[in-house]
Amino acid sequence: MQHIRNFSIIAHIDHGKSTLADRLIQRCGGLAAREMSAQVLDSMDIERERGITIKAQTAALEYKAQDGKVYNLNLIDTPGHVDFSYEVSRSLSACEGALLVVDASQGVEAQTVANCYTAIDLGVEVLAVLNKMDLPQADPEGARQEVEDVIGIDASDAVLASAKTGMGIDEILEAIVARVPSPEGDPEAALQALIIDSWFDNYVGVVMLVRIVNGVLRPKDKILLMASGATHLCEQTGVFTPKSQPRAQLSAGEVGFIIAGIKELAHAKVGDTITLAGKPAAAPLPGFKEVQPQVFAGLYPVESSEYDQLRDSLEKLKLNDAALMFEPEVSQALGFGFRCGFLGLLHMEIVQERLEREFDMDIITTAPSVVYEVVERDGTVLTIESPSRMPEVGKIAEIREPIVKVTLFMPQEYVGPVMTLCNNKRGNQINMTYHGRQVHLTYEIPLAEIVLDFFDRLKSVSRGYASMDYEFLEYRPADVVKVDLLINGDRVDALAMIVHRSNARYRARDVVSRMRALIPRQMYDVAIQAAIGAEVIARENVKALRKNVLAKCYGGDISRKKKLLEKQKAGKKRMKQVGTVEIPQEAFLAILQVEDK
């Protein structure tokens, strides 16, 4: 066990984490030269394309150090994005060390800071690596200073490296051997293994990536998953070098995979503890929590006949994505579909993109909404995921909305516009610090304001230089109201929205005027109204198409013309009583595109 080193890599998107992993694998001879491809560990197309890591991956490498001993290095590649922060914390808790990779030309970014603090909280030894030293604009001194100022770890002995050219790779490996502590654990004790990640394989079922903390696991052992209480027979154990290689056993301190013929991913939850059914451990490992979706949206097939196909596609996605939740939902306007819960906006985009790309589905997505807590007059607390489920105004004592803590980093010339944006989004400034040219802002902002378009607006006001990261804080009472849209007096459930009262009239007027442009003219007047409860706060009319009934009257008596007009009016009134208005698809999308002024 003295020769095992478990470490992971923390980096912001595009700071060279996956390329560095490739170099380390190459240097330790993990893959033959012909099997090397760029970003070996990012196995999904969408991961390579977007340049992000979604699922955790591992590689067990053998490295002959300068002191002549052979060390087993286990590299655990973590996702870097804020939506997957729970997966990051599980990956980090399986390690004793972490490489903090910082782009020497760009300095520290928000997500790096968040993940680095997670690592420090878990007691992981952090080694700084300044990457991309081959770039002409690299500034190692500035980056080193920033790491010390912003994160507060000693960067005087940071390794200068370039994953692209291969410079500094040996120094990194030596630093890992010298500075990362070897794992603690007792191979004799009862088995405790942490599930770092799990995914579904079409041939063998669920594959679990685990870190053995105590004890030994061999094939044919009967295992117990402590959170779900399920028991399974362990069929195969092994390690990834990134290719899978079976091993006769996994013992304390090692990282490897287990196949136990589990059919459903929901049984193998990330962060759960595995122990032996015959000789269980006294307590599970700390830190397990159920992942709760934060953002909800409705997904509907464009062709209602594809409903079953959409359900199958979502079920297949769920096999590999335990955080995705969905339940059937019916909307008067869009027909049958699903209400889906996601970890955050990136997660939502990825699910949509995978549905379109891997399953060839055409889908419509309704506006993302967040979960509100509603306290009724009699004291019951409801969680509301969709505006159509909000109880009547008279029954509500208070509504609480989720607040998130947002960390922002940007060059100082963009502080003004970014602060204006945060204040417009009902943000509350908590902190502001200067680190050289970079500014670090902390805000508390309602999640509902962030899910609409905060990220895009942030990138545009800062010309792409600002980076953000957010974490859920708590629910707080808020003055939010449900705005219903009525067409000719009928409520349209799919168009309802929950907005802050101060913003309600503006939003209502804007949506109503957009709807007016989109609903085609009928043979009678159509009234589009927005209402809070019974109070109408905005209205537009779509004028009727009408025939000129006076065309045949030349001169003559006025009463003749009156009679014809009255007759036309009565006819239109009858039509209005029986007619229904078709709402085109674009009208639903109009609701999504309303900007808050």
Curated annotation (Swiss-Prot):
It catalyses: GTP + H2O = GDP + phosphate + H(+). It comes from the Bacteria. Its EC number is 3.6.5.n1. Keywords: Cell inner membrane, Cell membrane, GTP-binding, Hydrolase, Membrane, Nucleotide-binding, Protein biosynthesis. It is found in: Cell inner membrane. GO terms for cellular component: plasma membrane. PROSITE patterns: G_TR_1, G_TR_2. GO terms for biological process: positive regulation of translation. GTP binds at residues 14-19, 131-134. InterPro entries: EF-4, EFG_III/V, EFG_V-like, EFTu-like_2, G_TR_CS, LepA_C_sf, LepA_CTD, LepA_IV. It is an enzyme of class 3 (hydrolase). Required for accurate and efficient protein synthesis under certain stress conditions. May act as a fidelity factor of the translation reaction, by catalyzing a one-codon backward translocation of tRNAs on improperly translocated ribosomes. Back-translocation proceeds from a post-translocation (POST) complex to a pre-translocation (PRE) complex, thus giving elongation factor G a second chance to translocate the tRNAs correctly. Binds to ribosomes in a GTP-dependent manner. This is Elongation factor 4. The gene is lepA.
